[in-house]
Amino acid sequence: GGDIDEYDSSISDSLSGNSLLKALNSLNNTKKVRSFKYADHKVYQQYIEIDPQGTIPNGKMLGFYDNAIVSGPWDNQETWNREHVWPNSRGGSSVEGDLHMVRPTSVKINSERGNDVYGKISGTYDPGQYVAEYRGIAARIIFYCAIANTSLVINEKTTNDGNNMGVL
């Protein structure tokens, strides 16, 4: 065990739709889990959200969506807030302790995003409007959340109802 090539070998290439989602959820549930309280993100974000290119000063982080340089240590929302990539109002509170889902975001961008689904049409928020690569990063996080908690639903709705998130 432990070989990366074996990790997802139980997932058949022939699976799709709900069958694939259930198989991925089952595989995901076998991983070792460490639970965090939402408040813990104030402490841990500065250690996991580092600049991969090493271009920002020590003790700082890159804000999600716009790469704004924000304070590493929690500063009571002066420069950054905890962005719920899958908004709590859309069921994201079920995964809010997961370090994959909550990201440091500048206060301005966090407010601008609100709880909109992602997209490029009116009433949605484009995660790549400032830095294009965040479209893919946000989509991967959304897929991960739907696999981690099967009550979260990915679809193409742009309305603010239920546990829906889509228009990726």
Map each language-model feature to its residues.
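N-terminal module-boundary/linker segments of secreted carbohydrate-active enzymes
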Residues: 1-69
